[in-house]
Amino acid sequence: MRAVVQRVSEARVVVEEETVGAIGKGLLVFVGVGKDDTEEDCEWLADKVSGLRIFEDEDGKMNLSVKDINGEVLVVSQFTLYGDCRRGKRPSFTEAAPPDKGKALYEKFVELLREKGLKVETGKFRAHMHVHLVNDGPVTILLDSSKLF
């Protein structure tokens, strides 16, 4: 599984002119599921995201997690994180999970974050979404359960 994690002061997702998920201070997490991913990948990613220390402590050092600051998480599915642009100029998405598997593991990831006590909002799986955010920092982190980066 891959994720782009952004520290935000606020974020929201709009589908067909309706806000389907919104948060204040916390993390916006774009999540892509690969064709070979398993629940173990979900567990690794949920643990990493929930414990990622990218919020500043009283000394201004990035030392606090989203849970430490009582922040919120907005999770948005994004299969395009598996876009392969090494050949040509049109991305190939053959490494992305098929929709049924992608949805199941995306929902498992959200469930695991909630089990960790986090307040989680979501986008809408397979919908065309407009994501509005205020990136705080900016701080943007890339995660990959295969540890490619």
From Swiss-Prot:
Gene Ontology CC entries for this record: cytoplasm
Mention one GO biological process in which this protein takes part, according to its record: D-amino acid catabolic process
Q: Which UniProt keywords apply?
A: Cytoplasm, Hydrolase, RNA-binding, tRNA-binding
Which Cys pairs does UniProt list as disulfide-bonded? none
Work out whether the entry's keyword set contains Acyltransferase: no
Specify the domain of life of the species encoding this protein.
Answer: Bacteria
List the CDD domains: Dtyr_deacylase (cd00563)
Give the matching HAMAP family. Answer: Deacylase_Dtd
Q: Which NCBIfam families match?
A: D-aminoacyl-tRNA deacylase
Q: How does it assemble?
A: Homodimer.
Q: What is this protein called?
A: D-aminoacyl-tRNA deacylase
Which species is listed as the source? Thermotoga sp. (strain RQ2)
- Gene designation per UniProt: dtd
